[in-house]
Amino acid sequence: MEVKTFGILLTFFLLNRFSASAQDSTTTSITSRFDPSKPTNTYDRLSNNLEYNFLRNGSRTFGYRGNLVLASHDQRNSVHIEIPLLYSTFSQKFGLSDIRLRYYWIPYKHYSRKPGAFGLLLDTYVPTGSFKDGLGRGRWIFAPGLSTAFVFGRFSTFPIVAYLYSSEIKDAKTSSPGSEALSGYIIQSICVYKFRKSYLDCTPIFMKNSYSNSGKDDFVLEGNYLYMIKPNKMQLGFFARRYFLGNSTTLRAAWRIYF
């Protein structure tokens, strides 16, 4: 309960912190510069996701995942807050899963140059979901890292290198492989191809000492397609992720709204 309370309070703090510095763009400036295909371009938005997870132990979770992004006026700072409400077939219970918080600081962007951007990030999972009910991992996860960008016309790639720390699973009744604290790293690159009204991204990820594979290495592949149905305001999309060694799959249908 203390972890859930902390996660909720931290979420509201970040919301209040960034609402004061949220974007203040006119319709003209948004239209001329709006390009959400690049991860280093951040805009205030809410993504509503219907999610289905095929887990390693054969159970399933499904439900709603809200993803709120708040960006500063100059786009150098942004906070991403994910709040999942899922049902577990393992326990037949519905509830809050692990909240995910991400912070990005992008002090440099100049896409005509190589590299076209540089920044720092912090990715955190808060163990707000019940481990015994199959709704959470039961551990804190921290991944501070560096990001950059290379843009080649319609194609762009955004490499990220991050340190990965996963705390010990506190709710585990017995010690099992991978339940101890883990230390490793993540190497990934978000590869994006932009069409006229949509874009497709594919992200290969290598995780050293991964929480997704009992402390062993894992290879992950993510794919995301988004189509702009209302210019600069609304997108529909589909997301898929596969942990190949951790043997789990995530599917999402998304409705994204820009403010």
Task: Tell me the role of every PLM-derived stretch.
Residues Q23-K132, R137-G153, T157-S166, L182-Y225, ...:
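Transmembrane beta-barrel domains of Gram-negative outer membranes and organellar outer membranes
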